[in-house]
């Protein structure tokens, strides 16, 4: 079985931000070993060595559903996968209308299903809920904007509509966002669970994504 992970910076494997004062440049620390689909791969290889699965990372930092539609043919369909895990939203909720996001999601689900690809829609993590002291100075304004969006519960609306479209096309749903919200409701400081204190989950929280995907991926591989 071949599975493509189609998403943004979280899927690519982006974590902390580092600031170089001399050049005035912010770098993203990438860690392909700690990304959720590699954690998933290692667990399946350990617990189900009989399964033959090829894993493809098609995550690109900064991508939205607009970008996804531009590269879906090359990065997903041309790979001829059996399964596609798609996780977009972090770069949509902050700068795109709900109607456009829903329309784009519908096109993505529809295109993948037309090509006979099994789809798992994984909802993203939360944004920060306040401006953390670790946020780089040149990202403080962004942190304030994202906190406002999260505290208005705007992502709830976007991902709820996306789940409806996923169900319409018979896609499985791994609802990571719901788990993050539950953690927040239980008093967990979810901003501390973000490696860049903005929108990139910590390495430990990538394990949550892997755990949510595990059963469905194994089920599909055993078919």
Where are these regions (language model features)?
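Serine-esterase "nucleophile elbow" of acetyl-processing enzymes
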Residues: 1-58, 71-80
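Alpha-helical cap/lid subdomain in secreted, periplasmic
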Residues: 39-54, 67-223
């Amino acid at each position: 079985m071949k599975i493509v992970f189609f998403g943004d910076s979280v899927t690519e494997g982006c974590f902390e931000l580092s600031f170089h004062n001399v050049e005035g440049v912010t770098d993203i620390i990438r860690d392909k070993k700690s990304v959720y689909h590699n954690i998933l791969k290692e667990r399946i290889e350990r617990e189900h060595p009989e399964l033959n699965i090829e894993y493809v990372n098609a995550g690109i930092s900064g991508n939205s559903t607009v970008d996804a539609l531009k590269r879906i043919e090359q990065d997903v369909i041309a790979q001829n996968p059996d399964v596609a895990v798609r996780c977009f939203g972090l770069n949509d909720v902050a700068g795109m209308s709900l109607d456009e996001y829903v329309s784009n999601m519908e096109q993505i689900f529809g295109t993948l299903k037309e090509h006979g690809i099994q789809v798992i829609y994984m909802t993203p993590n939360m944004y920060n809920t306040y401006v953390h002291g670790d946020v780089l100075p040149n990202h403080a304004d962004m942190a304030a904007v994202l906190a406002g969006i999260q505290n208005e519960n705007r992502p709830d609306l976007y991902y709820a509509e996306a789940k409806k479209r996923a169900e319409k096309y018979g896609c499985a749903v791994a609802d990571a966002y719901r788990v993050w919200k539950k953690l927040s409701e239980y008093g967990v400081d979810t901003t501390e669970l973000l490696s860049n204190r903005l929108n990139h989950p910590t390495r430990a929280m990538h394990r949550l994504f892997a755990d949510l995907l595990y059963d469905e991926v194994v089920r599909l591989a055993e078919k």
